[in-house]
């Protein structure tokens, strides 16, 4: 696996025996007001041994309102995202992916990746 760093370079995520890597997505950015950001990543096997990549996506129930957690915003740190249901969020990502042929990202995440080059 590789992740794209803030300079726009792909860096390896070396496998560590007995562990696994968890990628967080856009919902963590919304919940934490960008305290925890998703990383652009890709799965590559550059090793001579087999490597297993098992994507597993978890979303809240569709009617659940996704919004910044109370502990992640305040008077000098307003929420960066408008509240929306989980279904609205996922639908917007799927629609964007269909329009562009690229993975769906929130607008803020897409701009961050674009700025990195």
Where are these regions (language model features)?
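C-terminal flanking tails of non-heme Fe-dependent oxygenases
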Residues: 1-117
């Amino acid at each position: 696996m590789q992740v794209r760093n803030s300079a726009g370079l792909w860096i390896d995520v070396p496998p560590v025996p007995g562990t696994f890597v968890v990628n967080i997505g856009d919902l963590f950015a919304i919940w934490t007001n960008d305290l925890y950001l998703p990383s652009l990543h890709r799965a590559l096997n550059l090793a001579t041994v087999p490597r297993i990549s098992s994507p597993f996506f978890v979303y809240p129930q569709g009617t659940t309102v996704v919004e910044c957690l109370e502990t992640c915003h305040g008077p000098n740190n307003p929420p960066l995202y408008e509240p929306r249901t989980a279904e609205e969020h996922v639908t917007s990502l799927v629609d964007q992916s269909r329009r562009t042929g690229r993975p769906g990202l929130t607008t803020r995440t897409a701009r961050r990746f674009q700025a990195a080059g």
